[in-house]
Structures are given as structure tokens and as C-alpha cells.
Amino acid sequence: MTGHCLCGAITYRVDVEPMITANCHCRDCQRQTGTAFSVLVAVPRASLHIDGDIATHTTVGTDTHLNVRRQFCSNCGSPIVSLPDMTPDLAFIKAGTLDDTTMLVPEMDVWCDSAMTWVAMDDEARGQWARGVPLEF
């Protein structure tokens, strides 16, 4: 998989297939993306190779109270990846930055307790976690 930011200053590649794709409804993802949820693609951190001047903003997760490093393009501000301390071996790529999204189908919704009330979730199609993320996929 490959991807890039809006201006093209950041490019990345991943050497493996995604482990899982999820819609994250936590308040921090809502604030970072400026929308109802973030579509995240989980990959092993060691498989993610980023080129360009990536900036990092570290916050304490509102729900987890653990650090989350959010990396973004220092030029255009596009969010690229989240690196939560809660899952130290995983990187969560922002799906909108992928060059090819045709293979993506979200398999779960996480932090559903924080979902905006108007977001429709299909109980039958995906797993749902009210609070948190399953640590084993």
C-alpha cells in the first residue's frame, strides 16, 4: 500500500496487507479530522515507511488517558497516522491518505459511546465496541 498527504510532501508505503480497518468514533479522532469519525487502517508499525517532513503532536487520549502521537504533514496539515501507546506495535493510517482505497471495507466501529447521534451504524455488518478497541484481531 502507498499513500500521500494533500500537497504530496509526505509519502509512505506499507509492506504488508492491512490487519484491520475500523471506524473510530472517539472524540479525539472527531476533533483531529473535523468530522464524525476517522477511518483507520491498522498495520504493524515496523511495516510503515514514511518519507518527508512529518510533524508529530502528542496528546493524552481523552478516553484512554494514554499518549497518542498523531503525525501529519508539516506543510499542508493532512493527518497521516496515529500511534497510540495503548497499541505499541500498531500504526493506524488515515484511510483517506491511501492511494488506492478500493480494497477497504471497515470491519468494526470503535469508541461507539462517543459516536455522533446521527451516525448510522449497521449492527449486522460490523463489530461494535462501545469503549475501546479489541487488542487482538
Where are these regions (language model features)?
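A short Gly-Trp-Pro
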Residues: 1-137
